[in-house]
Amino acid sequence: MSQDFKNNFSWSNSRLSTFKSCKRKYYFQYYGFWDGWEDDVPERVRNIYRLKKLNNRHTWKGTIIHEAIAFLLKSLLEDKTLDKGEFKKAVVRKMRDQYKTSLSGDYKTNPKDNFGLLEHYYEEEVEKETWQLLRDDVIRSLDNFRGSQFWKKTQSLSMEDCLSLEGDLKGSDNIWKNISPNLNTWRNLPSSPAVDSFSLDGEKVWVKIDFAYQEEDGSVRLIDWKSGNSEGEPDSTQLNIYGYYATEVWDIPEEKIHLKAYNVNQDERHERTFSKEGKQETREKILKSVESMKEMLTDKKANEAEEEG
């Protein structure tokens, strides 16, 4: 293992959510799993790593939807035509393939390269209808998206207008290539791995912007896709972090930043403005939570922690 490969501390909104919800889960998620991919580690560490790589059916649904939307937008921005029906069939086919892979249990010996579901790992009795409803949620979400103002707006955009398009298609070679074999740059999404974070008082802050584009007047729209079943207000901190990123990395003035959240499952849209006050509040929240997170470290310099209890 490379000496440079270290578990360095960084901040993200999802990390904060885990920290606030359960300290034990936080430890497993960000510390207990480390080195679990190595051969000469205790079985407990390997098992923590294995569990970290698994998805539950709800996060799986969200990942599928995000990937599919990214591919739809990528295709549209490159003027590639996709058959609506064939695309949905291909997405369902991918879900079935991943489901079968999980059912095989291959993730138990190689969790890094094999998809796995927690429901299968724990041998939960999930009704067939539940899985079918999950599939229906995905299809409905894609239909809602293609009927949304965001899809219509993208039809008037060029690739140059797109500032960020998040969606990891690299692990999905077969499905995406089969859908559109002529999409020559299908894996080159405009989001750059080099700028998916910014530094705040020396702390790395990770950001994952689903979609962002710039208007002719220089204003920027940053959009977060949601796929949950519950309706409600979006996470204001998440959206404000997008705004913070835009000011720091793209040098966009606060007054030109427009934040949007769209729940494709519920066809529900929310919009927020960004401001200097909002940026300052976000800054203070991040730094305060960083301080709280580091209080549980046994070695702050090495970013090491021990399991409580």
Describe each model-derived feature in a short phrase:
Residues 71-75, 244-249:
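Active-site catalytic microenvironments for nucleophilic, acid-base chemistry
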Residues 217, 231-234, 246-309:
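Metal-dependent nuclease catalytic regions and adjoining charged, substrate-binding loops involved
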Residues 53-61, 126, 130, 199, ...:
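Conserved aromatic-histidine-acidic binding/catalytic patches
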Residues 11, 60, 64, 133, ...:
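Generic recognition of stable, solvent-exposed alpha-helical segments in well-folded globular domains
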Residues 68-187:
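A non-catalytic, helix-rich entry segment at domain boundaries
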Residues 37-41, 176-241, 246:
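Non-catalytic protein-protein interaction segments used by genome-maintenance enzymes to assemble
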Residues 16-32, 41-77, 92, 96, ...:
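Nuclease catalytic cores
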Residues 5-8, 33-52, 218-223, 293-301:
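Short amphipathic alpha-helical segments and their helix-coil junctions
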